[in-house]
Amino acid sequence: NATGQGNISISLVPPSKAVEXHQXQQIFIEAKASKIFNCRMEWEKVERGRRTSLCTHDPAKICSRDHAQSSATWSCSQPFKVVCVYIAFYSTDYR
């Protein structure tokens, strides 16, 4: 995001499974080259709002803070494995 602060979590589940998202502990997993998926976004919603609270630098003042929450649905699949064969043949006496 624009501030450089934020969390994102990604889970791969079957389409038939109901999923609930909750703000929970952060888990960082190193990506492996063998786990490659083709993904596309199917649905996205962004909710923006403004909150007011006491300023941290001067508690006598009120500061406003903009925030945004995004939700998205992605569809992912494993890429197709295609075998490509290229044969070059040259001969002056082909039988």
UniProtKB/Swiss-Prot annotation:
InterPro entries: Nxph, NXPH/NXPE. It holds the Pfam family Neurexophilin. It is found in: Secreted. Residues 22-30 are annotated as: IV (linker domain). Residues 31-95 are annotated as: V (Cys-rich). One of its GO terms (cellular component) is extracellular region. Keywords: Glycoprotein, Secreted. It comes from the Eukaryota. The keyword Glycoprotein applies. Glycans are attached at residues 1, 7. May be signaling molecules that resemble neuropeptides. Ligand for alpha-neurexins. This is Neurexophilin-3. It comes from Macaca mulatta. The gene is NXPH3.
